[in-house]
Amino acid sequence: MDIFCIRGGTPLHGRIALHGAKNAALPLLAATLATGARCELLDCPDISDVTAACAILRHLGCAVEQHGGIVAVDSGSACRSDIPAELMRKMRAAVLFLGPLLARFGTAELSLPGGCVLGARPIDLHLRGLRRMGAEITLDGEHISARTDGLHGCTVALPLPSVGATENLILAALGCRGTLTLCNAAREPEIGDLIAFLRACGADIRGEGSLLRIRGGVPLTGACHTVLPDRMEAATYLAAAAATRGDVTLTNVRPEHLTAVLAVLEHAGCTLTQQNGMLRLRCSRLRAAGPIRTAPYDGFPTDAQAPLMAAMAVAEGVTVFEENLFENRFRHVPALRALGAHIHAARRYAVVTGVRELHGASMTATDLRGGAAMVIGALCARGESELAGTAHLKRGYAELVPTLRACGADITER
């Protein structure tokens, strides 16, 4: 089943329990390799990217058990340091295994990762930092070969706060001699979650925010850790509730991780209330909010740009989006136009003039968050829409269809 059929026009009403974050679970799974012990991750989302990460761990020799939202990994039996191209192609975050492989085995053979096509998204910062730590890395076409006689501590100053590079260097530093000082590190909550897990395993990681010090060579143990709630899943459902003029309450949510998104929604006329660990959004009239500029945390997240654009397509007034992190991140715009949205996009900017009503259309998702935007657009459109390419959505949203149906959406999968 890979097509969603959506009949729009029904406001979303209900309660949604958020899953563990995709962007936290994937680096956590890579981190289990570095421990050489048994680890348990609770509230791990049932998404295809997690399945792909578990397949990589099994290929490397780890024992992996998946039961509901619990993933147990025993990496004591890991015996390989190569990842075949067919596994690497399944997700962008597969490159996060490079650091722990070097830390654990001193060698790694892999290829450039897959995942969503969002422009260049180079891994140069990963490789540059690892080379500075003593790794010899060659890149032959799409093949990456890495070797080291022993990583060593040093100071790495990232030219920009790359999330992936920060995670990879933290994981590599677990096996280095001395201390890695990481400057201009990314500050996303998912990195804080990774550090909390590693500290529970015994890692010596000091500092917080953009300056981190990781002392390598410290013996690690296993740990049980609950994955951080998914703030991008939260942003998506909040945008859907706003677009359909609904009333939705999120549970298992961390509002403090959504500051920039909540500010935009409040500016757009949504009523937001927080109580007892829950976040409620009510919307009867949606106004344009902007300009919306994507930025590293704690700015407006690039992963929320597409879902919010779908909501602004049916808001009163004009909203300007400025995408500052990734090129090629307006690939959802043609599909929203097919629904009747008035959007002009050029280079880093998209100008959205809200319309009173969208109409059904046939669309194909080309990436995870763009696919979410298409679902939101279809939910508030008159008539029926069909969305193909839903495998992209299954990479990052667990139980999307039943969750929306429970809130009153007319959505089926075939």
Task: Please describe what each predicted stretch is.
Residues M1-R414:
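Short, structured segments at the rim of ligand-binding sites
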